[in-house]
Amino acid sequence: MTENEKVTRNVQGRVVSNKADKTITVLVERRVRHPLYGKYIRRSSKMQAHDEGNECQVGDVVTIEQCRPISKSKAWRLVKVLERAAQ
């Protein structure tokens, strides 16, 4: 039999808030094609992620991955900071 490996979903986004303790809000943008007209449209989602070390600042570009639910609104955790915001 094959081993049961979890496939985690990773996304990249920009931190828009870090006001809560150990929590960041990440804005994830994606491009989708309009079904009738074919034009590409930007769609965005705000996700709350767990930041154990409070290391992120507003404007950072980060990678987050899906995990077990940590609270009512958090089911993502910070993997790494890709790019720091200009201070």
UniProtKB/Swiss-Prot annotation:
PROSITE patterns hit by this protein: RIBOSOMAL_S17
Keyword Membrane (UniProt): no
GO biological process terms held by the UniProt record: translation
Gene3D superfamilies: Nucleic acid-binding proteins
Keywords: Ribonucleoprotein, Ribosomal protein, RNA-binding, rRNA-binding
Gene Ontology molecular-function annotations: rRNA binding; structural constituent of ribosome
Pfam family, one: Ribosomal_S17
GO CC entries: cytosolic small ribosomal subunit
Entries under InterPro entries matching the protein: NA-bd_OB-fold, Ribosomal_uS17, Ribosomal_uS17_bact/chlr, Ribosomal_uS17_CS
Membership in a protein family: Belongs to the universal ribosomal protein uS17 family.
Functional description taken from the UniProt entry: One of the primary rRNA binding proteins, it binds specifically to the 5'-end of 16S ribosomal RNA.
Oligomer and partners: Part of the 30S ribosomal subunit.
Protein name: Small ribosomal subunit protein uS17
Organism encoding this protein: Alkalilimnicola ehrlichii (strain ATCC BAA-1101 / DSM 17681 / MLHE-1)
